[in-house]
Amino acid sequence: MARVKRGNVARKRRKKILKLAKGYRAGHSKLFRTANQVVMKALCNAYRDRRRRKRDFRRLWIARINAAARQYGMSYSQLMGALKKADIQLNRKMLAQLAVLDAPAFATVIQTARAL
C-alpha cells in the first residue's frame, strides 16, 4: 500500500483551528494544542448559549410584563389568561416592548383584556 503523506491536510486542519483562535491571548492563539482546546470549549459555549439566549429573553419579557401588569392591579398569569380569553394574539416580546416603550398602549391592552 502506498504511503500517505498528510502535510497539506494536517496544515489545513491546524490553520483552520488557529484562524478560529485569532484574537485569543498568548499560546491560546499560537499553539495548536491549546488553541484547539479553547476553540472547542468556545464552540461548545456558543452552541449552548444560543439556546440559553432564547430562554433568557423569554424570562426577561415575562418579568417586564409582570412588573407592568402589576401597576394596573393584575398579575402576569391573570393578564395572560385574560388575553387568551379576549383572543388578543400578542406574543410576550410584543407585550414587553409595549410595556417598556409605550405605556398608554399597554394600558389599553390591559383594559381590553379586562373588559372581556
UniProtKB/Swiss-Prot annotation:
Database matches in PROSITE patterns: RIBOSOMAL_L20
Signal peptide start-end: none
Gene Ontology process terms (BP): ribosomal large subunit assembly; translation
Alphabetized InterPro entries for the sequence: Ribosomal_bL20, RIBOSOMAL_L20_CS, Ribosomal_protein_bL20_C
GO cellular component assignments: ribonucleoprotein complex; ribosome
GO terms assigned for molecular function: rRNA binding; structural constituent of ribosome
Keyword Ribosomal protein: yes
SUPFAM superfamilies listed in its UniProt record: Ribosomal protein L20
Keywords attached to this entry: Ribonucleoprotein, Ribosomal protein, RNA-binding, rRNA-binding
Presence of the UniProt keyword DNA damage in the record: no
One Pfam entry name: Ribosomal_L20
Family according to the record: Belongs to the bacterial ribosomal protein bL20 family.
Role noted for this protein: Binds directly to 23S ribosomal RNA and is necessary for the in vitro assembly process of the 50S ribosomal subunit. It is not involved in the protein synthesizing functions of that subunit.
Descriptive protein name: Large ribosomal subunit protein bL20
Organism (species): Thermosynechococcus vestitus (strain NIES-2133 / IAM M-273 / BP-1)
Gene giving rise to this polypeptide: rplT
